[in-house]
Amino acid sequence: MASGILVNVKEEVTCPICLELLTQPLSLDCGHSFCQACLTANHKKSMLDKGESSCPVCRISYQPENIRPNRHVANIVEKLREVKLSPEGQKVDHCARHGEKLLLFCQEDGKVICWLCERSQEHRGHHTFLTEEVAREYQVKLQAALEMLRQKQQEAEELEADIREEKASWKTQIQYDKTNVLADFEQLRDILDWEESNELQNLEKEEEDILKSLTKSETEMVQQTQSVRELISDLERRLQGSVMELLQGVDGVIKRMENVTLKKPETFPKNQRRVFRAPDLKGMLEVFRELTDVRRYWVDVTVAPNNISCAVISEDMRQVSSPKPQIIYGARGTRYQTFMNFNYCTGILGSQSITSGKHYWEVDVSKKSAWILGVCAGFQPDAMCNIEKNENYQPKYGYWVIGLEEGVKCSAFQDGSFHTPSAPFIVPLSVIICPDRVGVFLDYEACTVSFFNITNHGFLIYKFSHCSFSQPVFPYLNPRKCGVPMTLCSPSS
């Protein structure tokens, strides 16, 4: 009820020209009211067309000076603009401004309007259509837009998932890099500590040797000085004494004088000293990274006893040593050390047969003066071929090994030359620090066997390339005739 009254009031205060609520309403003598702007425009048009002004509704002429502002209507419009229909009174399909049913669609403004809106100044001249006519067209457009948005939503969700995945990946990678950096610098600190300790030990040894020599020279010089001083004292006494004292034993004194020679002390020029050079940290770090990489392929190697080898094996199958020699006596009681096995062989194979992939293991050879280790293609059926002779340690016979002799001579065994095929080509290896622990890396597909000096920060000792692995190969250890055992290290050691 209140809603209907309100609509009627709105119709009474609506401008007949623009069909909007009156703005600055002006009233004519006939009683009709118009917006100031609308009436002014109509007055100008009427004066041009007819030479007089008339009411747009009832056509009664009026004089401009008789136009008066309608305060009462202005107050009603002002109050009406403040009034809002209650939710119960509102109708979705009715115009909020005019209360008429919304049956038209303005194409230019994209709005649903009523017939009064269509005639208003706001929509005058626009293309309007019945809502039923354009609903299907816009439904198709909106459906297509909806499908497109759903597709974009799916793409956005996929991109969001990709970003989350990339974010997690980057976080993992950075954390991995942080761990590596910490490990690298920890290794560098260990290397620096080791180098510092080693260099200080060298300096202390140098100081000890030089001071010992200088002390010896100092003692000799003190003795020489004392001898010369005594001779001078004897001569002074003779010269100051009587003739008898002067000539008594003078020949001996003269001979002593002639025999006086000063032995110059041994000197140690500082400019000839060994110059300290800082370690190549970059090179050490590269070596450390290479060693870290190959250690990912560390396998737990043990040895396998066989009838050919006479090597002594520990219970855990990790430690290998040579047998103790037998003591025999000759016909005249002479003692001899010999090995009862005629086909003496201390070499032993690892229990793992390798036919593919990458494999790494480490061998502890500390305190040993002789050893051979590496990779072997297996023992030959003929035991005589396995007797320990250097000519057998050649790649063509299935041995890719390096060895140590006399505690200092480190060598690799390559195939002999065309002229001396029976003798291996022994490659002397320059090892700054004799290894106490050796790492062996076998890459079956790449046909390479590499040896690393774990004692010296993992520097590469030697590498066999283009190896002919035509059959399974095995880790190989040989303690030689040195009584100290060699031990296969576990990955956790």
From Swiss-Prot:
Zinc finger (RING-type): 15-59
Task performed by this protein: Capsid-specific restriction factor that prevents infection from non-host-adapted retroviruses. Blocks viral replication early in the life cycle, after viral entry but before reverse transcription. In addition to acting as a capsid-specific restriction factor, also acts as a pattern recognition receptor that activates innate immune signaling in response to the retroviral capsid lattice.
Protein name as catalogued: Tripartite motif-containing protein 5
B30.2/SPRY domain boundaries: 281-493
Coiled coil: 131-240
Localization, UniProt: Cytoplasm; Nucleus
Binding locations of Zn(2+): C95, H98, C117, H123
Chain residue ranges for the region called Required for interaction with GABARAP and for autophagy: 185-198
Subunit structure: Can form homodimers and homotrimers. In addition to lower-order dimerization, also exhibits a higher-order multimerization and both low- and high-order multimerizations are essential for its restriction activity. Interacts with BTBD1 and BTBD2. Interacts with PSMC4, PSMC5, PSMD7 and HSPA8/HSC70. Interacts (via B30.2/SPRY domain) with HSPA1A/B. Interacts with PSMC2, MAP3K7/TAK1, TAB2 and TAB3. Interacts with SQSTM1. Interacts with TRIM6 and TRIM34. Interacts with ULK1 (phosphorylated form), GABARAP, GABARAPL1, GABARAPL2, MAP1LC3A, MAP1LC3C and BECN1.
Keyword line: Acetylation, Antiviral defense, Autophagy, Coiled coil, Cytoplasm, Immunity, Innate immunity, Metal-binding, Nucleus, Phosphoprotein, Transferase, Ubl conjugation, Ubl conjugation pathway, Zinc, Zinc-finger
PTM: Degraded in a proteasome-independent fashion in the absence of viral infection but in a proteasome-dependent fashion following exposure to restriction sensitive virus.
Zinc fingers, B box-type class: 90-132
Reactions that this protein is recorded to catalyse: S-ubiquitinyl-[E2 ubiquitin-conjugating enzyme]-L-cysteine + [acceptor protein]-L-lysine = [E2 ubiquitin-conjugating enzyme]-L-cysteine + N(6)-ubiquitinyl-[acceptor protein]-L-lysine
Pfam families per UniProt: SPRY, zf-B_box, zf-RING_UBOX
Documented EC number(s): 2.3.2.27
CDD domains per the UniProt record, alphabetical: Bbox2_TRIM5-like, RING-HC_TRIM5-like_C-IV, SPRY_PRY_TRIM5
Keyword Signal belongs to the record: no
Pathway this chain belongs to: Protein modification; protein ubiquitination
Organism, as annotated: Pan paniscus
Phosphoserine PTM positions: S86
